[in-house]
Structures are given as C-alpha cells and as structure tokens.
C-alpha cells in the first residue's frame, strides 16, 4: 500500500454553482462539514417546499413541481457508463418513491418529507462564510430563497455578504455569452478575491465588502450598498375597496399568446389576473427588504396554483 498525499491542497474547500448547483453549497454548509471554508451560491434554494409551493398552493407547473424531476434532470450519475443495471434500477426506484411521497402530502408543508430540504432549520451547524448571489428578476428561484439563507448565516454568526443584480436566473458571467460588470468590477475578479482570502489567507479586504451590493433598476449601470437587507422602517399600503374577484384559466378569453404574455398577465387586469395599483408616491421610495401581501383566496377546482408579483408601474 502506497500512501498518496494531496500536496496540491491545503485542505480548505469552497463551493459555488448556480440553481441546483447553487443549492448544494447551502445543503453542505448546513451539515457543518469540516474543511468547507466558504460558499458562493448563485440562485440557490434554501427551502425546497417554498420553491415548489406557496402556502398550500402549487407554485410550479405540473411536471417540474416534483423534486424527483429536478433531481433526475441534474443528476450526472445517470451518465456514468460504469453503472450496473441494478444500480440504475435502484436510482430510478428512489426517485419514483420520492415522487409518491411528495404527491401523498399534496401542496401542504409536511415536515417528514420537506424537513430535510429546509436548510435554514440547521443554521446552528453552519461553520463557513458565504457570498450569496441572486437575480432580482429571477422567476425561477425567487429572492425569498436568498433572504432565508442570508438570515441563516447571520443567525449562525458567520460572515455573509450578498450581490443582488437585476438579471434573471443567471450567473453574472457566462462563458461565451455575456457578463455583468458588478459595480465596475468583473464578477470573476470579485469571486477570485473572495475565495483567495478564505482558502489562501490573502489579505485583500474581500471579507469587508459591503453587506449588500444591489444593482439599481432605474439605471443598471449604478450599484448601491447597504449595511443590512432590511431596515427598521415599515410602510403599509391598504385598499379601502372591498369585494370579490374571480379569476380563471381561460387563455382565449384573456387573449394570451406567447408574444403578449407579459403584457396581458403583468401590466393589466384580465379574467386570468388582477392588477392592483396604489396611488402615485409623492417622492422617490426605495423598497428595501421583504414585500408582504395579505389576501384571502379560495380555489374552486383544478390545480391549486397561484402567484403574486409586485411590479413598479413606471417600469411596466
């Protein structure tokens, strides 16, 4: 037996990735594994239940509402040519059973099924730092997921920073595609500085970057910083009108097509969506933190699916 030492490694590890691969750093960090010094999750999921559902209503379209679908889609193990037929059958059986258990619980939160994928429940195990990256216009993994893990790292007393860009479900730099200058710096340079500090002890000040760095929606060349995600201020917007509104899924009546979907569903009311507009603000207001909407709804039949999307009417 010959002992092989990994002399190329100092034993310190970082994790990064986007979407499913951005979720894995959260999952590993909340195990408290030794050697994981920092993570840079991009559009990662903090809680699988709230990613797929919204308080008992389905958030995703039917096929992709199942965790097993995404687990299968993102599993590189199926491409392993050395797998035996028995191993493939066991993996398929596992994903099938996962689907059955999820369907059994419906759209309500079931701790037995969803608890393992609710990483914020294990904030006390976190031992590493985090630089969390999230798109504010990501309609796949919402900002709620970023917020939950940001608070989890704070609860654990670990250094956590955030970069919030105006993009969708993207990494701020994509090979051969595009890149976003993050406050005048290349994204890759920022990540290099962060990881170099935590893995190699480079004194570059990366750990002292702003708590929150956010790209402005009114001018995407501008970035602003904040000391925290939320503020001590609260603003309540109420509606004096009362009544009952009924919406349905009659696409033809709404005149919805692939070309006009955003206009019909996002900027005006129809039989498929209702738009509520506040009075114009008398001065510029920056919403910092979480937007909460309280409403009551009943589902007559069909899929229990609902969604809410706050929009700046000046942008619409």
Predicted features and spans:
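Gly/Ser-rich "nucleophile elbow"/oxyanion-hole loop immediately N-terminal to the catalytic nucleophile
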Residues: 1-14, 19
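Short beta-strand immediately N-terminal to the catalytic nucleophile in serine-hydrolase-like folds
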Residues: 15-17, 42, 133
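Glycine-rich nucleophile elbow surrounding the catalytic serine of serine-hydrolase chemistry
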Residues: 17-27, 140
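Accessory cap/linker subdomain of secreted extracellular hydrolases
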Residues: 27-125, 203
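Short beta-strand/loop motif that positions the catalytic acidic residue
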Residues: 126, 132-134, 138
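Conserved alpha/beta-hydrolase "acid-adjacent" motif
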Residues: 139-146
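Catalytic histidine neighborhood in serine/cysteine hydrolases
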Residues: 153-172
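C-terminal, loop-rich substrate-recognition/catalytic regions characterized by aromatic stacking residues
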Residues: 179-316
């Amino acid at each position: 037996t010959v002992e092989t030492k990994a002399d190329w490694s100092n034993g310190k590890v970082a994790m990064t990735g986007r979407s499913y691969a951005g979720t894995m750093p959260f999952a590993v960090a909340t195990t408290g594994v030794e050697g994981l010094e920092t993570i840079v999750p991009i559009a990662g999921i903090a809680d699988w239940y709230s990613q797929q559902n919204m308080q008992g209503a389905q958030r995703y379209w039917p096929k992709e509402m199942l965790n097993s679908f995404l687990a299968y889609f993102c599993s590189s193990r199926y491409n392993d040519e050395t797998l035996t037929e028995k191993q493939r059958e066991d993996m398929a059986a596992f994903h099938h059973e996962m689907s059955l258990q999820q369907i059994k619980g419906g759209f309500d939160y079931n701790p037995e099924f969803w608890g393992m994928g609710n990483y914020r429940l294990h904030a006390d195990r976190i031992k590493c730092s985090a630089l969390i990256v999230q798109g504010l216009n990501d309609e796949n993994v919402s900002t709620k997921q970023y917020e939950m893990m940001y608070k989890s790292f704070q609860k654990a007393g670990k250094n956590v920073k955030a970069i919030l860009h105006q993009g969708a479900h993207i990494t701020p730099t994509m090979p051969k595609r595009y890149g976003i200058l993050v406050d005048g710096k290349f994204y890759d340079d920022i990540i290099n500085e962060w990881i170099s500090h935590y893995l190699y002890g480079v004194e570059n000040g990366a750990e002292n970057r702003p708590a929150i760095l956010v790209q402005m929606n009114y001018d995407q060349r501008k970035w602003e910083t904040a000391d925290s995600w939320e503020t001590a201020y609260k603003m309540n917007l109420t509606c004096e009108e009362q009544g009952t509104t009924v919406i349905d899924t009659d696409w033809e009546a709404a005149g919805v097509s692939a070309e006009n979907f955003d206009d019909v569903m996002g900027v005006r009311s129809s039989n498929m969506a209702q738009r509520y507009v506040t009075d114009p603000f008398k001065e510029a207001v920056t919403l910092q933190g979480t937007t909460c909407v309280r409403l009551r709804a009943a589902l007559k039949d069909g899929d229990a699916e609902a969604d809410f999307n706050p929009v700046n009417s000046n942008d619409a």
